[in-house]
Swiss-Prot record:
GO terms for molecular function: 5S rRNA binding; structural constituent of ribosome. Belongs to the bacterial ribosomal protein bL25 family. CTC subfamily. InterPro entries: Rbsml_bL25/Gln-tRNA_synth_N, Ribosomal_bL25/Gln-tRNA_synth, Ribosomal_bL25_b-dom, Ribosomal_bL25_C, Ribosomal_bL25_long, Ribosomal_bL25_short, Ribosomal_L25_dom, Ribosomal_uL5_bac-type. Keywords: Ribonucleoprotein, Ribosomal protein, RNA-binding, rRNA-binding. Pfam families: Ribosomal_L25p, Ribosomal_TL5_C. The keyword Ribonucleoprotein applies. The keyword Hydrolase does not apply. GO terms for biological process: translation. Part of the 50S ribosomal subunit; part of the 5S rRNA/L5/L18/L25 subcomplex. Contacts the 5S rRNA. Binds to the 5S rRNA independently of L5 and L18. This is Large ribosomal subunit protein bL25. SUPFAM superfamilies: Ribosomal protein L25-like.
Length: 197
């Protein structure tokens, strides 16, 4: 059983015009795919999906999707938002199959930021989420990045993070040791440089 539940209806009216009509009717188009079943087009009430995803944890948890009363466990794969207003315009969900690995983007939580700042550093967050591969039962709510021991000039990479048990960082598995955050010296404004001379 999951804490996150979303209701949907099967959708047969497809295409750009149909999607636009849905949005005008305060609903959004969505699709669920994966597992042994065919992809299925859905309609979801816009307020209901917006409320669910106000909780950051919903992005990285198994969601119980009720499609016309039939329940299935899914995770969000992708979400399209309006570029200016930020509301959800479309969602893709992937079915969760027990024993099979899935990929999902998990939010990053940075802790211990005060220590490098007290040493005169500025912190740049390079990523806000990390793509992971794991079974649904091992899907973490977030990945924690501890910056308490970071010195000025330090770059934190994926390889510096400890993945939770059963979880693999997708980029790292493909040889891409991405930067996650860096601690750098404060940039001096051009006016300040001129005043110093």
């Amino acid at each position: 059983m999951t804490d996150f539940i979303l209701n949907a209806q099967a959708r047969t009216d497809l295409g750009k015009g149909a999607s636009r009509r849905l949005r005008h009717a305060a609903s959004i188009p969505a699709v669920v795919y994966g597992g042994d079943k065919e992809a299925q087009s859905l309609t979801i009430v816009a307020k209901e999906i917006a409320k669910l995803f106000e909780n950051e944890a919903a992005y990285s948890h198994v969601i119980e999707l009720n499609v016309d009363g039939a329940k299935q466990n899914v995770v969000v794969k992708a979400m399209q938002r309006h570029p200016a207003k930020g509301f959800i315009m479309h969602a893709d969900f992937v079915r969760v199959v027990a024993g099979q690995k899935l990929t999902a983007k998990v939010p990053v939580h940075f802790i211990g930021e005060e220590a490098p700042v007290k040493k005169g550093g500025e912190i740049s967050h390079v990523v806000s989420e990390i793509e992971v591969s794991c079974e649904a039962k091992d899907l973490p709510e977030f990945i924690e990045v501890d910056l308490a021991n970071a010195e000025v000039g330090t770059i934190i990479h994926l390889s510096d993070l400890k993945a939770p048990k059963g979880v693999e960082f997708v980029a790292l598995a493909h040889g891409d040791d991405k930067a996650v955050a860096n601690v750098h010296a404060p940039r001096v404004a051009p006016e300040a440089e001129g005043a110093a001379e």
